Amino acid sequence: MPAVVITEFMDQEGVDLIAARFETVYDPDLVDRPQALDALLADCRGLIVRNRTQVRPPLLAKAPHLKTVGRLGVGLDNIDLSACAAAGVSVLPATGTNDETVSEFVMGALLSLTRGGAFQATADVAAGAWPRTRFKARDAKGLRLGLIGFGAIARQVARRAKAFGIAVAAYDPFVPEADPAWALADRRCADVATLLEGSDIVSIHVPLTETTRHLIDAAALARLPPGAFLINTARGGVIDEHALVAALKSGALGGAMLDVMEAEPVAAGSHLAGVPNLLLSPHIAGITKDAVLRASLLVADNVARALEGGTPTVADAARGR
């Protein structure tokens, strides 16, 4: 029976790296075949997942020999960290492998929004239309960007935004005031309300917790200057989508880009369909060929290290160290 089971897509170089050290089963469709997965869990010691495999008590109970879980990404919504810690199972995310990747996506979204949808004009132009007056664009230079959360990805966004002449403000109560990272921001905000009121563009970079769920609700959106833009590449539940749709339809909000939604995938005919000035993408801000390779190699190496009794190069998320 395999020592390592990989249930979702992983770059082949990462698969080869772990398979050279442990008997490995790689089947990216296992996440959708629970009975087949259950049969492999009985003897597996290492499990590698993306964001769909639910690593919770029912799965852990079927994997009595499990020692470590490798997460091909950084979000941990699908992994019960407390249950893993109680079972003595380490959780090793792909920390740092897509920070720059996501920040590039955020900047692309920012430029698309501030250009008033000009990058979505292909079909009209190809059909013979010439809608030059339809697009109400703004220069990026001189705008004020507010970052909610100031971790690794947000800091990369700050670096790139400042290169465009954008003023950067940030809010993060978990980053100490003396942290040198604040040098990347022009302004450190004491609360979300202050940040919203002084931002032309807001980009969200916080995990989904009970504290952050619907952090951006109707009241928060009302604090933004008229015509402001909102970008979310973090977690869908941080924004109250119905409040967002109302703000876009009323024209109070100039535009929004969502790479993450409260329900993924979005149901056909959902409240997000046909909303003006709303750009959607299928949770791909951190996915490029390069980022997937980096994550796959890092996770493969760290899972192998953990199973060999070595020291992984990333912190164990289940124990916070």
Name what the model sees in each region.
Residues 55-59, 173-271:
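Rossmann-like adenosine-cofactor binding region
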Residues 7, 50, 72, 109, ...:
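Short, well-ordered coil/turn residues at beta-beta hairpins
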Residues 1-92, 197, 217, 223:
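An N-terminal-biased, well-structured beta-alpha scaffold segment characteristic
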Residues 105, 227-321:
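Rossmann-like dinucleotide-binding domain for NAD(H)/NADP(H)
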Residues 150-151:
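Glycine-rich Rossmann-fold phosphate-binding loop(s) that bind the pyrophosphate
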Residues 154-155:
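N-terminal Rossmann-fold NAD(P) dinucleotide-binding loop
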Residues 45-46, 68, 201, 229, ...:
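Short, Asp-centered acidic motifs that coordinate Mg2+ and/or phosphate
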Residues 87, 95-144, 159, 178:
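Phosphate-binding beta-alpha-beta segment of Rossmann-like dinucleotide-binding domains, i.e.
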